[in-house]
């Protein structure tokens, strides 16, 4: 059955995303999507930045440029590091790195942006990043974040997609963001990109707040799977999945040693165990099966 003949609701999210970007640009060329994550306030458990770095490694991304203007960083908060490079020592300054990738498993090119949330001049920083996006003909931006929440570590990590762009909401069947309150650089970039005419998607995962320290491989895995579905990637997640299982066992052991924590986790489990969990939906199960088939598919000769 051809893609055109399949019901809309059964087509992969990545295919809908690609088609929307091509139709918007009136071209059949591979679109370029910028994916960003920042360490700091938007990155509970280091899950978002770890997910984007994992994609950069898997896609064999090459470093394209750095944004290291010292006006953006408070070096007492984000300190430079000293490291040895052969017989010499060097200073590594905080920066935002931009990587370029053309993953074979996807129908799009990627600009992967990873760094530390800047301390100062956010408006100038976002303007500089959006200038880089325009220079590279970026068709859409994906912002990746993780937040602390009242969720149990024993259940699937909740994750969500949203966009301020009405056309993307319809194409991807996602909601408009409803959050109001303090925001980080991820929220600023999502709104600024939309105002600049670059459609933006925000992807967030909820990290159990009682184990919010890094690493958080279970949340990282949830974000990587969402990015697989959205970008059409095929990622090797076995190592991260093993880390997630070990992490969950470790938290189980800690909870068993403290009756108050164990009781609290049980209350969170009861609150989350509803019949309408998105992880149990037909669409979620279908996406998981598609991932399984992609990983089993032999490479083309």
How should each PLM-predicted stretch be described?
Residues 38-42, 112-122, 172-180, 210-214:
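Flexible, glycine/proline-enriched loop segments at strand-loop-helix junctions
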Residues 211-301:
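A conserved C-terminal secondary-structure "cap"
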């Amino acid at each position: 059955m051809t893609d055109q003949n399949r019901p809309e609701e059964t087509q992969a999210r990545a295919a809908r995303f690609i088609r929307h970007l091509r139709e918007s640009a009136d071209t059949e060329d591979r679109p370029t999507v910028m994916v960003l994550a920042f360490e700091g306030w938007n990155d509970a458990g280091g899950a978002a930045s770890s997910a984007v770095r994992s994609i950069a490694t898997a896609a064999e991304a090459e470093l394209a440029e750095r944004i290291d203007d010292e006006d953006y960083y408070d070096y007492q908060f984000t300190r430079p590091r000293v490291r040895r490079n052969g017989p010499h020592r060097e200073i590594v300054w905080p920066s935002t790195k931009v990587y370029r990738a053309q993953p074979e498993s996807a129908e799009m090119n990627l600009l992967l942006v990873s760094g530390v949330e800047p301390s100062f001049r956010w408006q100038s920083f976002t303007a500089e990043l959006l200038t880089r996006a325009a220079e590279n003909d970026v068709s859409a931006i994906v912002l990746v974040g993780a937040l602390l929440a009242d969720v149990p570590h024993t259940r699937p990590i909740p994750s969500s997609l949203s966009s301020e762009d009405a056309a993307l909401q319809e194409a991807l069947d996602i909601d408009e963001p409803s959050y109001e309150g303090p925001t980080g650089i991820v929220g600023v970039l999502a709104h600024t990109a939309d105002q600049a005419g670059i459609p933006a998607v925000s992807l967030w995962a909820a990290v159990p707040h009682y184990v919010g320290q890094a690493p958080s491989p279970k949340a990282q895995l949830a974000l990587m799977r969402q990015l697989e579905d959205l970008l059409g990637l095929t990622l090797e997640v076995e190592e991260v999945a093993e880390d997630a299982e070990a992490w969950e066992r470790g938290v189980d052991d800690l909870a068993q040693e403290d009756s108050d924590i164990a009781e609290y986790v049980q209350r969170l489990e009861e609150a989350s165990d509803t019949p309408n969990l998105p992880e149990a939906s037909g669409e979620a199960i279908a996406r998981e099966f598609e991932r399984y088939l992609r990983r089993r598919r032999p490479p083309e000769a």
